Amino acid sequence: MMQALTMRSWLATLVTALLAVAIWPDPGQSLPQGAPETVCDTMLPFHSGGSVLPQNSVSPFSVETSSSTLGQGQTLRVDLTGVPAGLSFGGYMIQARNRNPPHQIIGQFGPARDGTIKLMNCENSVNNSATHSNAGPKQQVILEWQSPVDFLGQVVFNATIAQSYNEFWVGVPSQPVQIVRRDLSAAPPLPTQSPSAPAGTTRAPYVPPSYVAPNNVVAVSSDPIYNGCGQSKNCFGFPDGCVATKSCTSITVVTVRGDVFEFEIQSGKGTNAAYVAVGLSDDAKMGDDLTTECVPENGRVNLYSSLTSASPYSAVRSNVNQNSARLLDASIVDGVIYCRVQRDAVTNVQGRTFDLRNGKYHLLVASGSSLKENSVGYHDIGRLPSAQPINLAEVQDLSGSSRLLIQLHGAFMIAAWIGTTSLGIIFARYFKQTWVGSQSCGTDQWFAWHRLLMVTTWSLTVAAYVLIWVELKQAVWHAHSIIGLITVILCFIQPIGALFRPGPNDKKRPYFNWGHWLGGNLAHILGIVTIFFSVKLPKAELPEWMDWILVSFVVVHVLVHLIFSIGGMASERHLSQRANTFQMGDMSHHQQHAMRNGMSMERKMDAPYAGMRKGLLGVYGVVLILFVTVLILLVVLAPIEQFLGKS
């Protein structure tokens, strides 16, 4: 009898052990029936009795919502996916929580038709959380979530996602979703209210701090992004000085807490920005800058890191570690882009090290209205670098870098080589037989004007050359600078050569005339070519269509030369016909003497068609002033797109 009992006991133990092994979860799988309601508060899996801890690395999974704004009582699509797409996971748990205290669970999830979603009742409410109904591998989960009818404010979806039994991430957040009145979806969000359903005590370790993006009916002065500027955080935006007036077209805010570097970036209202970005630069010039871009795509704001290139302008994302920055918060409300980003203290990009703890950097704020494939477009809305490099941890008032010297350099060179040089050459070539007998400062009119215009060219060129050296503080070699240097050298040679001009009857005078003509025209041509090359310089920020204005000027200038040349030939023919009217051999001595006296008198008179030359000179002068004015305005107001966009 005792032996039979012992045998039954042994069999019972064996069966129990076998059953235990059969139902014991596979270490490579999540819990087959989903998360229990005992973890509603923590969302922390109790795998292997709690001995398996959540991963502390960046989650390879994301929580995406179909919209960043939702009306009360409306339905929202929520997607759980891997990054990159196709990465599978086994289990999950998700719930939406109020961004503001008390961080209670908000809304309800809808059941799946195929039964793949298990709904949970947390905090004495129904279906306000969801988990998996089976632990099989899945690449995407699509859920439907309905907002309460009595809640206004922002919610964040938090998820726990398990790739395997031993690998899971807790607190994977979505971007904030703004719950607004259903009948007034564009109205400003009211102070956050709790829904009527009772709320238990909850924790919120993974819910980002509160930030409500501004909208077009909230006063600019109430925008919280400006709070603490210059006191607890660095703020910089454009146009220059906009932080003080709280009216920035784009702004970045830098907050440093130990080794934590947070950047807030926001576009302005009514700018129609396609992106907003901030760069870290050693020299305040475009090129080799670490850039953080916030780009709205498919109803959500995405974060990208890139390295800029100066010529041609580009912001390249390849070979830049996209995990060097993490998106903590983002929204787009009424066209205003906002994101809050945490960057690593040290980032290595293509052999360059950006050390935010020890380095000093210029802040470059930029925004534009267009995107390229895998890149942002040109910053036509605006761009501004800070005047001085700063240690990001040192809070201070920042001002924009001045472009005055660059603008003066460009304006002086345009006035010199498009304006005064063009007119000076016209006087020297076509007006030696005009205003004959009239003098200024003891010299013929044509020479007085030619000398005045060329001295002005020399003065403007020297001043512009000095200004750009003061700005750059170093030699920069590219087509614009090399051809420009040759032009400056020729500009110096011309007046020096003029000091050694041979006399009118000197046998060397023709050689001087040809050399002076060649040097002057070569300098003029190279000066205009140099201006063409300036259009492509990123620091100039000139529009590409400025090339067509320059081409138009060249066409007009060549056409004027052609008309003057034809007029000159007609004048010479007229004089020749008058001289050949009588044959000298048929004249008496008295007649020949009278003829010579008549020709001598003609030399003291203007050549034929002087009125035409004067009239054409007046028209050309007016057109030249218009060209110079337009080109200087493009330089001084660069980038001109920001003004054209406001008109």
Curated annotation (Swiss-Prot):
Which ranges carry the DOMON domain? 245-368
**What topology in the membrane does the UniProt record assign?**
Multi-pass membrane protein
What is written in the cofactor note of this entry?
A: Binds 2 heme b groups non-covalently.
Where heme b 2 binds, per the record, is at: H450, H516
Subcellular localization, as worded in the UniProt entry = Membrane
* Record's GO cellular component terms: membrane
* Sequence intervals crossing the membrane: 10-30, 408-428, 452-472, 480-500, 515-535, 548-568, 616-636
Keywords assigned: Electron transport, Glycoprotein, Iron, Membrane, Metal-binding, Oxidoreductase, Transmembrane, Transmembrane helix, Transport
- In the record, what terms sit under GO molecular function? metal ion binding; oxidoreductase activity, acting on metal ions; transmembrane ascorbate ferrireductase activity
Domain (Reelin) ranges: 25-195
The enzyme's main class, written as a single word, is oxidoreductase
This enzyme's EC code(s): 1.-.-.-
Co-factor requirement = heme b
Q: Which residues form the Cytochrome b561 domain?
A: 372-570
PANTHER family from the entry?
Answer: CYTOCHROME B561/FERRIC REDUCTASE TRANSMEMBRANE, FERRIC-CHELATE REDUCTASE 1 HOMOLOG-RELATED
Q: Which family does it belong to?
A: Belongs to the FRRS1 family.
Q: Report the protein's function.
A: Putative ferric-chelate reductases reduce Fe(3+) to Fe(2+) before its transport from the endosome to the cytoplasm.
- Protein name listed in UniProt: Putative ferric-chelate reductase 1 homolog
Q: Which organism is it from?
A: Drosophila melanogaster
Print the organism lineage.
Eukaryota, Metazoa, Ecdysozoa, Arthropoda, Hexapoda
